């Protein structure tokens, strides 16, 4: 560890000790978060509506405040964007994280209060570096620059003083100036709206810089890496940036991309660290490089609740606090935060791998799964299966999506996968057969429905021509940033749209 990194790393040690206490004090820490959130918001319009002052504990909170979706809170958020204060949260909120919308809206605008910005998102970034340095005492992290690949922001159409953009852009815009000393590219470049021009500008401004860390979404960072290699004529990223040591990634599963990164960055010193930083808050980070699970961050002014996946959408689902969850079960996450979200259903599903400390994997989205035949196929099943089959066959998958395909009588059907390959497998039939068998190994419900083909026929694969998924994102105005391909869908909307592009 160089002198600068060693000196700065001393500042992280007190926080490392606090995180270690998560294993013993999780329940008390969580209830402290709830008490503080209720106290802070007791005089807001929302707090007065539900009489926060009289809430004595979790039982009262759970009984009094209904579960919320974006459609439920949208009228309040709109008023906040228009300059009203003391609505969902006491402070005036000038920044909003823009994310993919609901059935009724093209986009969601989620409040980014000063409190959640500092006490959740930036705290998560601080802790990520802290844990990374703790796990890698030979790091030279602060001796070189970090490249952050973010989105863009633009003034909200609702109010001149309210700004919106994808989360990464909001975070970059409000970043401590000291952090900018160790970050590239220039803020003006990273916040460019037009994706393809941005990639060119990033490459031109950074390829001669000493970069040792990357931060971003795996799929989009891969585009940038290939652009850097094309610019320099290099085979490996370490030829361009020899001090490269870590990629902080999130937004989508890293599994389908892991082998491609290892091929382009063939270094024993290269590390990969996953974070869970959503528009609604920073929720988890990978604290053990030997495990793919994430540590739930329980002291970020976020109170967590969980709905068993089979009860999502019910009028009165079971809702559990953190102390009541079980290992191995899929839950939809519900959050209460210093961003003014109260019992808010974010749409992500998680599965706990350990308790005390609470570790989990992101298993998917409440809307991104296939359960047309009772198979309950989740995104993490699909990602793992694709990754395993690629290793077995030597194939490389660039993007994929899957949806049910019903037979004429609708009593039977199959899953149709559309896959864009970076490298085709020797035999597509063998790839499909292996994928089908691997899904059965990973998911007992899928295996049961495939038994003797009673309700589910063998899956089929349609090969997408090069650029199909990129073009779909371009037409949707979703190039770059935190935009992602829907991996699984219970209907055929996405796959039909992709099919039309593929046929054109």
Q: Where do the protein language model's features map onto the residues?
A:
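Conserved adenylation A10 loop of the ANL superfamily
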Residues: 96-110, 461
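Active-site glycine/GP-rich loop and adjacent strand/helix microenvironment
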Residues: 1-53, 61-68, 76-83, 168-504
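Conserved AMP-binding loop of ANL adenylate-forming enzymes
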Residues: 131-177
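Conserved pre-ATP/AMP-binding loop-to-beta segment of ANL
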Residues: 81-98
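Accessory carbohydrate-recognition regions in carbohydrate-active enzymes
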Residues: 37, 56-57, 69, 114-121
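Short, solvent-exposed loop/turn and secondary-structure capping segments
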Residues: 110-111, 159, 226
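Conserved structural elements of the adenylate-forming
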Residues: 112-134
């Amino acid at each position: 560890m160089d002198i600068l990194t060693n000196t700065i790393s001393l500042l992280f040690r007190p926080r490392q000790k606090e995180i270690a206490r998560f294993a013993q004090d999780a329940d008390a820490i969580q209830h402290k978060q709830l008490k503080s959130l209720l106290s802070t918001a007791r005089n807001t319009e929302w707090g007065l509506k539900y009489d926060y002052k009289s809430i004595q504990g979790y039982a009262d909170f759970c009984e009094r405040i209904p579960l919320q979706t974006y459609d439920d809170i949208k009228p309040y958020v709109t008023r906040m964007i228009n300059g009203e204060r003391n609505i969902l949260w006491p402070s005036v909120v000038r920044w909003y994280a823009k994310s993919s919308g609901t059935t009724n809206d093209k986009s969601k605008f989620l409040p980014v209060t000063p409190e959640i910005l500092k006490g959740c998102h930036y705290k998560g970034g601080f802790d990520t570096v802290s844990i990374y340095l703790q796990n890698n005492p030979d790091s030279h992290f602060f001796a070189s620059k970090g490249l952050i690949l973010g989105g863009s922001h633009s003034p909200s159409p609702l109010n001149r003083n309210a700004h919106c953009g994808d989360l990464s852009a909001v975070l970059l815009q409000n970043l401590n100036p000291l952090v900018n000393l160790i970050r590239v590219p220039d803020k003006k470049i990273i916040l460019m709206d037009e994706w393809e021009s941005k990639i060119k500008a990033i490459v031109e401004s950074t390829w001669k810089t000493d970069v040792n860390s990357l931060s971003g979404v795996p799929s989009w960072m891969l585009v940038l890496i290939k652009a850097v290699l094309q610019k320099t004529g290099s085979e490996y990223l370490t030829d361009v940036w020899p001090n490269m040591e870590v990629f902080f990634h999130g937004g989508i599963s890293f599994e389908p991309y892991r082998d491609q990164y290892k091929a382009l960055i063939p270094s024993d010193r290269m590390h990969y660290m996953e974070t869970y930083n959503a528009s609604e808050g920073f929720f988890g980070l990978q604290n053990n490089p030997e495990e793919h699970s994430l540590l739930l961050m329980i002291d970020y002014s976020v109170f967590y609740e969980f709905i068993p996946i089979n009860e999502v959408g019910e009028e009165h689902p079971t809702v559990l606090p953190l102390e009541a969850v079980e290992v191995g079960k899929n839950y939809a996450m519900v959050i209460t935060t210093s961003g003014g979200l109260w019992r808010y259903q974010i749409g992500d599903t998680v599965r706990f791998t350990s308790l005390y400390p609470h570790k989990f994997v992101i298993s998917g989205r409440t809307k991104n799964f296939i359960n047309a035949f009772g198979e309950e196929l989740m995104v993490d099943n699909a990602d793992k299966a694709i990754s395993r089959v690629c290793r077995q066959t030597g194939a490389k998958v660039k993007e994929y999506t899957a949806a049910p395909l019903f037979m004429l009588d609708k009593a039977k059907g199959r899953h149709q996968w559309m896959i864009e390959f970076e490298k085709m497998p020797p035999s597509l039939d063998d790839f499909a057969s292996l994928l089908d068998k691997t899904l059965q190994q990973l998911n007992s419900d899928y295996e049961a429905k495939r038994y003797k083909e009673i309700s589910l026929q063998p899956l089929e694969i349609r090969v997408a021509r090069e650029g199909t998924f990129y073009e779909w994102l371009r037409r949707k105005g979703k190039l770059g940033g935190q935009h992602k391909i829907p991996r699984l869908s219970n209907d055929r909307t996405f796959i039909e749209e992709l099919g039309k592009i593929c046929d054109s």
